[in-house]
From Swiss-Prot:
This is Glutamate 5-kinase. Residues 282-360 form the PUA domain. Gene3D superfamilies: Acetylglutamate kinase-like, PUA domain. ATP binds at K17, S176, D177, T220, G221, G222, M223, V224, S225, K226. InterPro entries: AceGlu_kinase-like_sf (IPR036393), Asp/Glu/Uridylate_kinase (IPR001048), G5K_ProB (IPR041739), Glu/AcGlu_kinase (IPR001057), Glu_5kinase (IPR011529), Glu_5kinase/COase_Synthase (IPR005715), Glutamate_5-kinase_CS (IPR019797), PUA (IPR002478). Substrate binds at S57, D144, N156. CDD domains: AAK_G5K_ProB (cd04242), PUA_G5K (cd21157). Keywords: Amino-acid biosynthesis, ATP-binding, Cytoplasm, Kinase, Nucleotide-binding, Proline biosynthesis, Transferase. PANTHER family: GLUTAMATE 5-KINASE, ISOPENTENYL PHOSPHATE KINASE. Its EC number is 2.7.2.11. Its main location: cytoplasm.
């Protein structure tokens, strides 16, 4: 068994993401029996000494039957209505499942915007930390009643990666109807040329020959979403296991199933992770070629002299994207000036600026190359 599977097996803090298809029958009916099976596997992991945070999809699916809908709704308003009804059923089901073990659950509803704003980000972190300290099981879900993009894309995959870093998890386990990563769709590959199972991914280069298809009709997150989220978490230093919910006992036990994504050797700091992945960019700075080299290759601070244009609406302390002359993003960072102020400084040497404007536009400590 690889060192990364060993790390997942021995992780003391784990985030488990459970997709919609893991909680429904093939016909789309919310299945409490499946949820109880998953709760049993998670309980076994917690009894072994791990803290577990659950990121659970399934609110919309759980709302279909109570609202007497015949299928998953297509329009946004009905999706949000189903989510508002289904979230109650979902959390009650988790509460009943863990109640068998005399455990209390706590509901945490988030959107990507909550994670992106530093104050809300810190509040969410404190809440999750406190729930764990009080030995409650945190059930995290996207707030589908107010979110829009989250309903259309991701099925909590990206959120789970963000939460894993938010709580300082030692491992992220993604459970759905997908048993791991293949270089093609195993359901469509011919018998004489079956899709090859990929046991371990060391980095993006290992995915060069992988063809990712679309997800199930019940969820919104397909393989593309899962790959993106797994690579995000791994890049931040968190090992990831992608496995089938049916294999949850093994995934949460000895981590012998599924595909493991190896983490980068050094864990990214919380601030750099927030700048790189979590924060919403409020604007864009366009850099000349010399500034791109200084920022990307030399890891130096960005000076106003290297900025040729600014766009968006930002203020000092906001996160902005740094783009080259071809409009390709090369970095993200925390800008030191308001847009109106920075616009008067473009292309000017530091020595030509007033003393109060001689700080870098983006300090090297607040820069993350992409």
């Amino acid at each position: 068994m690889s060192v990364h599977r060993d790390a997942i097996r021995g992780a003391r803090s784990v985030v488990v993401k459970i997709g919609t298809t893991a909680l429904t029958t093939p016909s789309g009916v919310f299945d409490r029996g499946r949820l109880h099976y998953l709760a049993d596997a998670i309980e076994a992991r917690m009894k072994a000494g791990s803290d577990v945070v659950i990121v659970s999809s399934g609110a919309i699916a759980a709302g279909i039957e109570p609202l007497k809908l015949t299928k998953r709704p297509a329009d946004l308003a009905t999706k949000q209505a189903a989510a508002s009804v289904g979230q109650v059923a979902l959390v009650n089901s988790w509460s009943a499942a863990f109640g068998r073990y005399d455990r209390t659950v706590g509901q945490v509803l988030l959107t990507a915007h909550d994670i992106s704003m530093r104050v809300q980000h810190n509040n969410a972190q404190r809440t999750l930390d406190r729930l764990r300290a009080l030995h409650a099981v945190a059930i995290v879900n996207e707030n589908d009643t107010v979110a829009t993009n989250e309903i259309r894309f991701g099925d909590n995959d990206r959120l789970s990666a963000l939460v894993a870093h938010l709580v300082g998890a030692d491992a992220l386990i993604l459970l759905s109807d997908i048993d791991g990563l293949y270089d093609g769709d195993p359901r469509k590959a011919p018998e004489d040329n079956p899709a090859r199972f990929i046991s371990e991914v060391s980095g993006p280069d290992d995915l060069a020959d992988v063809t990712a298809g679309r997800g199930s009709h019940l969820g919104t997150g397909g393989m593309v979403s899962k790959l993106s989220s797994a690579l995000l978490a791994a890049d931040a230093g968190v090992p990831v296991l992608l496995a089938a919910a049916a294999d949850a006992a093994s995934a949460l036990g000895d981590a012998s199933v599924g595909t493991v994504f190896a983490p980068r050797p050094e864990r990214m700091s919380a601030r750099r992770f927030w700048v790189r992945y979590a924060a919403e960019a409020s604007g864009t700075l366009t850099l000349d070629d010399g500034a791109v080299r200084a920022v990307v290759q030399q890891r130096r601070s960005l000076l106003p002299a290297g900025i040729s244009a600014v766009s968006g609406r930002f203020f000092g302390g906001d996160v902005v994207e740094l783009r080259d002359q071809e409009n390709a993003m090369v970095a993200r960072g925390v800008v030191a000036y308001d847009k109106a102020e920075l616009a008067t400084m473009l292309g000017r040497s530091t020595s030509d600026l007033p003393a109060e404007m001689r700080r870098p536009a983006v300090h090297a400590d607040d820069l993350v190359a992409v």
